[in-house]
Amino acid sequence: MSFRQRILEHRLEDSLEKLFSAFLSFCLEYHIPYAETISKQNHSIVAVTFDETYGLDIYQTMKERLPLDKQFYYINRKTDTYTIRGYDVAVRALEELATVISPLEILDKIHIFNISFVRSTNILYLGYTKIIKLSTVYSAVYQNKLYRLFAIYNRDITMLSRIRKYIITDYPKLFEQYFSLLPKFITDNYEVEQT
């Protein structure tokens, strides 16, 4: 590996670390349930939440049933393999919410924020997904042009910094637009450790 390649490799790793840190900070700031998956093949974070009314219900139910450290904050950056799959967090949230309201009634209320880096292809995916109902079928879609799916080829460092800015500025705006009550509710009802 040439000196230039080593420098680019270092810059890539540094940029990716900052990118994932920005995403985790977003989840922690707004107390969004998330799961992080780390393996030799990929590194991904999936954060799941619900429309305002249902969100209040699920968080209240979680508060009554589970201590905070037994809920959704799965993270271990020191191991090469990780057993919890990212979408387990969505299943876990649905199981909790099913005690309050039928899951079929709330599928179209689910919002998923995700970031994933696939090491074998050097592609980074970033998106905001909403579950929608088309006739009798539920589908996961990226909602209009604001919530883009980024695919990065050839280790584009400039694009990584642009995506980090997107997470830091646009995700909070989006979240606050849909879930203005949740952060205050969680702050009032939980003791959240910023680890």
From Swiss-Prot:
This is Uncharacterized protein ORF195.
